[in-house]
Amino acid sequence: MTIKRKCGIIKTERRKGLKNLKGVIPLAYKSIIALGRQYGSGGREIGEKLARLMNVPFYDRELIALAAQRSGIAPETYASIDETATNSLLYALSTGAFMFSSHFTSSVDLPLNDKLYILQNKIISDIAEKEGSCVIVGRCADYILRDNPNCVSVFVYAPLEQRIERIKKKDGITADAAESKIVKTDKRRANYYNFYTNREWGSITNYELAISSYPLGSEKTAEMILEYVKYREKVKSE
């Protein structure tokens, strides 16, 4: 097959075996995917693959970098407390101790954990408003964007056995060490989510779509989520 390029357009003398042209042109999506995940389920990888399939921005640890830029605090400092809750934010909220904005004005010195949550809350809201379609992993994005009609809340899970095996291979540790890491990480994420949202992390009633990454694997799971997004957008446009 000979392919010629003319004036920036790819032309072919033989179309057999080529993908449908519609499959080459990126679709313009409206959906914002807020993706929660169990540790070891491959949620981050699935989110990255989904963002590539949709040709939209992907945000996970990138939110830490954005928070650091806005606050002037080192990214390493925020990374060490990311998705970790404290018990002081509700008190500050009840006393009106701070203003919800990109700058903090407070009579109470909020811990960095709470400042990071507030700042990421603002960043996620700004991203949804200004950038539109994207994939956001964790950080209570499903709750923050709960009133946004374009937000699709997704939770990725997998059987414990498969998660243990994944973390074993990824980190080069024993099965016992992998299980311990999974339990601790999931507990930290649950505490963070439950505290800041007053919801139950991982409860399927809090998500529009809950999907197991096993046995499909990350690629097929991302494709399944995308099919749901496509159908959802079609239904909403009718």
Enumerate the predicted regions with their spans.
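Glycine-rich phosphate-binding P-loop
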Residues: 35-48
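Small-molecule kinase domains that catalyze NTP-dependent phosphoryl transfer to phosphate-bearing small molecules
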Residues: 87-93, 174-218
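Short beta-strand-centered segment that lines the nucleotide-binding/catalytic pocket of NTP-utilizing
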Residues: 57-68
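Conserved phosphate-donor/acceptor-positioning beta-strand/loop module used by diverse small-molecule
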Residues: 147-171, 175-183
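ATP-dependent small-molecule kinase phosphotransfer cores
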Residues: 68-133
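Pre-Walker A (Motif I) flank of P-loop NTPase domains
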Residues: 29-37, 132
